[in-house]
A protein has these predicted regions:
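Conserved donor-binding/catalytic core segment of Leloir-type glycosyltransferases
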Residues: 228-245, 251-254
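Carbohydrate-associated surface elements
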Residues: 194, 216
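Aromatic "clamp/platform" in nucleotide-sugar-dependent glycosyltransferases that forms part
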Residues: 315
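Conserved acidic donor-binding segment of nucleotide-sugar-dependent glycosyltransferases
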Residues: 350-357, 366-372
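Short hydrophobic beta-strand element within catalytic cores of glycosyltransferases
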Residues: 332-335
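Acceptor-binding helix/loop patch of EC 2.4 sugar-transfer enzymes
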Residues: 72-95, 137-179
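Nucleotide-activated donor-binding/catalytic signature segment of Leloir-type glycosyltransferases, i.e.
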Residues: 277-301
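A conserved catalytic-core segment of Leloir-type glycosyltransferases
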Residues: 42-105
Length: 410
């Protein structure tokens, strides 16, 4: 394929937290390795990428680096009082997450973008779904990892206060803008079939304009590990302890397992909220649960190799990187019945009802007691590992979509 000039658009690209910055890094470097010229236009936090990739900062006020109202007002005072800045502040101050709403407007005000916009062959948006002009949307591909409507609905389900529910709805009101803006996009990339289905449902977007491409994942350091001794060591990975990660039901299942007279330990990789720390104490699980904050890659792999069974319990994931990593190391896994997990796990895992701690307990018990089943799932994990691919192959799949956009066949 000929060398393309590609603009990656991302309203924020934190390299250390959440998936968006990691996605931008991996995609941009894979496209660079494929011989393309890549420029990233991003709000803060900026991505950390290969020095051959040009990164252009799109100015954003930084209101969401703090949740202190006085600090936000000070940020506003330091801004030029343009119509855009005033509108952004009012929306922020009244509880809306505004970064994706106004990213498109701020991009158009960026001097570097104004000078170079016409030179790009294709624009690739990373879930900003902002209000881009026709000059961009006619050459635009958007990656939509999953509909954030799901996060909103789960947050609402886990909140009892009427006022807090109103606040949650206000925060997620940017979704109304995104639904309108997505209709102008020629092609959407979804990381799983389940996410594609939900994009159609929540955004009322045409199914035939959504391409499913599993995310690339670097498995070079996730070697298949043959386990010998079995010690009932379970492991789960959470990027952040939010209700969607469903940690509460994992802890309840461990408690039920203990009451059934079975001994098992759980390692939680990630940050813990106080509510779940308290739940561990209240259930008398302190001696059975250990938790590690975000770890260097090598330490993460060591813990996976020292574990016997992995649990991926989220109520929703557009694509579960931790699940794939567990499968790649040969762990038998237990996964929730929601979203992409059954699709990714294939026959390498058991499936439980995500809102049923007793069902999870039964699956844990089954794997503890059934050595032959553990061996079967571990062998299936070894086979399933080959279904996943790296970011260079992902870039090749992107090239096919870019060619469709450029040739006008979409």
């Amino acid at each position: 394929m000929k060398k393309l000039k590609i603009a990656l658009l991302s309203y924020r690209s934190d390299p250390f937290s959440g998936g968006q910055g990691i996605y931008v890094k991996n995609v941009s470097e894979a496209l660079l390795n494929s011989g393309h010229d890549v420029t990233i236009f991003s709000g803060k936090p900026l991505p950390l990428v290969d020095e051959k990739i040009k990164v252009v900062e799109v100015h954003t006020p930084g209101y969401f680096e703090t949740f202190n109202s006085l600090e936000r007002f000070k940020i506003f005072q330091a801004q030029e009082k343009t119509r855009l800045n005033v509108w952004d502040f009012i929306e922020t101050f009244t509880g809306t997450f505004t970064e994706p709403i106004f990213f498109g407007d701020r991009l158009l005000q960026n001097t570097e973008f104004a000078k170079t916009a016409d030179s790009f062959d294709v624009f690739h948006d990373n879930q900003s779904i902002s209000n881009y002009p026709d000059s961009i949307t006619k050459k635009l591909v958007t990656t939509l990892h999953h509909p954030i409507h799901v996060d909103r609905d789960i947050d609402l389900e886990n909140e009892n206060s009427f006022l807090n529910k109103l606040s949650i709805k206000r925060w997620y009101s940017f979704l109304n803008f995104q639904k309108k803006n997505l209709k102008k996009v020629k092609r959407v990339i979804s990381p799983s079939k389940s996410s594609k289905k939900d994009i159609c449902r929540y955004f009322d977007y045409p199914e035939d304009q959504i391409s499913v491409i599993w995310n690339g994942i670097d498995l070079d350091d996730c070697k298949f590990h043959q386990r010998s001794a079995f010690n009932s060591e379970f492991v789960t990975i959470i990027s952040s302890d939010v209700p969607m990660k469903n940690l509460k039901n994992i802890l309840k299942a461990l408690y039920l397992l203990k009451n059934d007279g079975l001994s098992a330990r759980l390692t939680i990789i990630g940050d813990l909220r106080e509510v779940n720390k308290k739940l561990i104490e209240d259930l008398g699980l302190s001696d059975l649960v250990s938790f590690k904050p975000k770890l260097p890659r090598n330490e993460l792999i060591e813990i996976l190799n020292a574990s016997d069974i992995g649990i991926a319990a989220s109520s929703y994931e557009g694509f579960g990187f931790p699940l794939v990593e567990m499968i790649a190391t040969g762990l038998p896994v237990i996964v929730s019945d929601k979203a992409s997990f059954p699709e990714l796990a294939g026959d390498a895992g058991l499936i439980f009802s995500s809102d049923d701690a007793n069902d999870l307990k039964e699956k844990m018990k089954e794997l503890i007691k059934n050595h032959a089943l553990r061996e079967e799932l571990a062998n299936n994990s070894k086979i399933r590992r080959d279904a996943f691919f790296g970011w260079d192959e992902y870039a090749k799949k992107l090239e096919d979509l870019f060619e469709e956009i450029i040739s006008g066949n979409v």
